[in-house]
Amino acid sequence: MNTTKMSEESTMTQPVKLLYTAKAHTTGGREGGAARTSDGRLDVKFSVPGTPGTGTNPEQLFAVGWSGCFLSAIKLVASKMKVRLPADPAIDAEVDLCNGDDGYSLRARLNVSLPGVDRQVAQSILDGAHQTCPYSKATRGNIDVAINLV
């Protein structure tokens, strides 16, 4: 197996306690490729958005991953704030693939619904979740992000 060492300038920080490592094998990329997780729970085919292909694409997977993680962060923050969440909190995630002068990039919107929660309290929960969620941390300062309370 070939590995690429990161330069000293871009070394990864070591986690205090490793909780989980996701493993996936991908071939072919978005143009007819496929991916499968090591445990087999996710097994997908890729296709380019806007083509007749029936596969998913990296942007859809990113939207699903981030919204699922962010919803867990919302639940954690609400619990710490001792706020009871509704039974049906939801996130509609939108991830755009863009192409500009600097090449390809992403931008994202997480449209969060917390029915029945006071608007100021809900906004505090979202702010805390955005500071807690690993996806939010990974994208902070790297892509345009909007977290909207709807």
Predicted feature residues:
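Extended beta-strand/beta-hairpin segments
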Residues: 2-64, 71-150
